[in-house]
């Protein structure tokens, strides 16, 4: 579970929030993610439909020669309307044994993960990811066994 790279501040963007792009630092983070995430043997990449999420994982997806799947239910706009859609998405994705990268937002990612972690202590500072950070979720048969935090690429 990856939070998108650093985006332009909301105050600096006049368009719709879903169209808010990465800033210079976020674009650099996206490029640097390639060498980091190649080691995980990712088999599928799913992203929110927000431009900043798409642009975060698009370079990696190309480098891995994968198709990028856009999923609206993990967007901030969808989350504000119906939180259960993202929760159901998380419950479905955990059934898949493949290595999948999901790129979305705070508060969506922390709540999705919270619903999946029943038997482990999920207690990271504020239970939030900084831009470009990720949680690596180790699971087997729909049960989360461990969570590791992956720092954002340095810029």
Segments predicted by a language model, with ranges:
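Active-site-proximal alpha-helix that buttresses catalytic centers in soluble enzyme cores
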Residues: 1-81, 110, 122-133, 151
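Short, solvent-exposed aromatic-acidic interface loops
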Residues: 148-155
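Active-site-adjacent alpha-helix immediately C-terminal to a catalytic or transition-state-stabilizing loop
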Residues: 87-145
């Amino acid at each position: 579970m990856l939070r998108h790279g650093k985006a332009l501040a909301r105050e600096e963007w006049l368009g719709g929030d879903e169209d808010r792009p990465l800033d210079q630092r976020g674009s650099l983070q996206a490029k640097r993610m390639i060498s980091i995430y190649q080691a995980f043997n990712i088999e599928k990449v799913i992203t929110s439909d927000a431009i900043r999420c798409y642009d975060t994982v698009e370079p990696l997806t190309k480098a891995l020669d994968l198709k990028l799947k856009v999923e609206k239910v993990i967007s901030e706009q969808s989350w504000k309307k119906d939180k259960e859609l993202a929760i159901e998405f998380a419950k479905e994705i955990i059934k898949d044994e493949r290595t999948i990268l999901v790129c979305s937002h705070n508060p969506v990612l922390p709540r999705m993960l919270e619903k999946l972690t029943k038997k482990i202590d999920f207690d990271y500072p504020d239970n939030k990811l900084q831009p470009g950070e990720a949680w690596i979720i180790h699971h087997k048969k729909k049960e989360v066994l461990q969570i590791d935090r992956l720092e954002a690429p340095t810029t």
